[in-house]
Design a protein with these regions (language model features):
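Beta-rich strand-turn-strand
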Residues: 105, 305-308
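Phosphate/pyrophosphate-binding loops and the adjoining catalytic core of nucleotide-dependent enzymes
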Residues: 315
Length: 334
């Protein structure tokens, strides 16, 4: 286990904020984590980070930052049709996807190149191109921060919805994910109906590796590489509005894209709303709206978290003014 004081969080946030944690703790097993918690009633306030691809630090963190280095992948169940694989929370998400594809297992390929770690995938319910982590997750193994007890959550207990889970809501900050068990298919099954995957494949017969590479190309074309330009992926969630509000908006803006969701509600791409407000490529100080995807805010170099937040607020205000729609951050602001 590693414990550091006044530790730079630069490698732990893709926005590139050079902030410090008063204490930083990295553990590489459940036993190390529970051992640390047993001896440290002073663990609060605390924040658990993964790859930091969905975090915006606006100041130094005065408490304890925890990071999992729990690695490993273990097959825990298998039939002719599927395989259940239990993965350590500290594994890099895209390494897991690459591994699944190399093994010939179906289900994770549309989630290629999403930054971050496996533990966060189960908290955030990451998603792309018509697939969400919740579609693959069977169990989430956790440790309770207060009691140090282990608890396994079945998929249904995680209350998953679009970019939401019980770990972000009712149980926020209460449980640490240590392992996630995914069920992947052994028989060919692709989701190619979303976005331009089909077009990117160019009529070729889909294969696991082919779909993975198509998704990687699409993402690289639209989303900035955090190593080159600090960012947290989509800064806002796509708003979901009641049908009546959508109808009224569609009358005024007939070309507005939309996706119907449960309960007769409609999801509108926040990127389109922001784009229509004229923000694409605009900046305030060293914080900018990415020129190729308006949903992404970028650090042009040396921006503070507060500067990024100011830009985010200005963007959200103009969307509210023009469309009457509230957009909420997907990124966690600390
Ligand atoms: N659009 C614009 N202008 C823009 C951006 C988008 O007009 O600047 C329009 C597009 O033309 C399209 C629609 O908005 O009609 C949706 O855009 P896109 O397909 O790029 O997807 P998104 O809704 O912007 C979501 C996820 C992404 C995920 C993609 C693909 C959220 C908040 N974001 O983006 O996830 O990769 O779909 O499935 O749901 C992330 O969460 O960090 C992330 C990148």
């Amino acid at each position: 286990m590693k414990i550091y004081k006044d530790y730079s969080l630069l490698p732990y946030n893709t926005f590139g904020m050079d902030v410090k944690a008063a204490r930083f703790v990295e553990y590489d097993s459940v036993e190390e984590l529970t051992g640390f918690l047993a001896g440290h009633e002073d663990v609060f306030p605390c924040l658990h980070v993964g790859g930091g691809s969905n975090l915006l630090f606006t100041a130094d963190y005065a408490g304890t930052v925890l990071h999992s280095a729990i690695k490993g992948r273990e097959i825990v169940g298998e039939t002719e049709d599927w395989v259940d694989i239990r993965v350590g929370a500290g594994e890099v998400w895209d390494d897991f996807v690459a591994y699944a594809v190399a093994c010939g297992w179906y289900g994770a390929e549309n989630l290629s190149l999403i930054p971050g770690e496996v533990g966060a995938s189960a908290v955030q319910n990451i998603g792309a191109y018509g697939v969400e982590a919740k579609d693959l997750i069977r169990f989430v193994d956790t440790v309770c921060l207060e009691t140090g007890c282990r608890r396994r959550f079945a998929n249904e207990e995680c209350c998953y919805s679009y970019r939401e889970s019980v770990f972000k809501k009712e149980l926020k900050g209460k449980y640490i994910v240590t392992h996630v068990t995914f069920r992947l298919g052994k028989r060919p099954a692709f989701r190619l109906d979303y976005g331009n995957i089909q077009a990117e494949l160019g009529g070729a017969e889909p294969t696991l590796e082919g779909v993975r590479q198509a998704v990687i190309r699409i993402r690289r074309a639209k989303l900035p590489d955090p190593k080159l330009l600090g960012n947290g992926g989509s800064f806002f969630m796509n708003p979901v509005v009641p049908a009546e509000q959508f109808e009224a908006l569609a009358q005024r803006f007939p070309d507005m894209p939309c996706y119907p969701v449960a309960g007769g509600r409609v999801k509108i791409p926040a990127g389109w709303l922001i784009d229509r407000c004229g923000w694409k490529g605009k900046s305030i100080g060293r914080a900018a709206v990415y020129e190729r995807q308006a949903l992404v805010l970028v650090n042009l170099g040396g921006a503070s978290g507060k500067e990024i937040l100011q830009l985010a607020q200005a963007v959200a205000h103009s969307v509210k003014d023009k469309f009457g729609v509230t957009i909420a951050p997907e990124v966690n602001i600390i």
